[in-house]
């Protein structure tokens, strides 16, 4: 993918047929449910769910009742850490409100959402998949006198 990461809002309905991409495709469910087949495995992205499709994975989709997804097309190698054999997951805690904000910002034409949104989504997704470290035990903290 020669172009920069691209965020978009997409409404899904009937299937256009099986296809693949040369980049990661990240789907974040905002409303409805999207049924996918990725490399022969069934995947469902419902509201609050997400899916990372790896480059080259053949996939097809359908949404009988319609669905709205925030979609990121990205060649960033960091998404490889998020792609898994499970494919679909509940969005990490910080990713869902971020996805809603980015969707609103895209609709309102806020350019910084397109510029910085892809990196923020990756950061939020990765943060949700790694153990959290407590800030309360920092060596820099001391009691207040």
Where on the chain are the PLM-derived regions?
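N-terminal regulatory/effector-sensing and dimerization cores
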Residues: 1-86
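General nucleic-acid-binding
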Residues: 66-68, 76-116
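A short, Lys/Arg-enriched amphipathic alpha-helix from helix-turn-helix/homeodomain DNA-binding modules
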Residues: 92-99, 103, 113-145
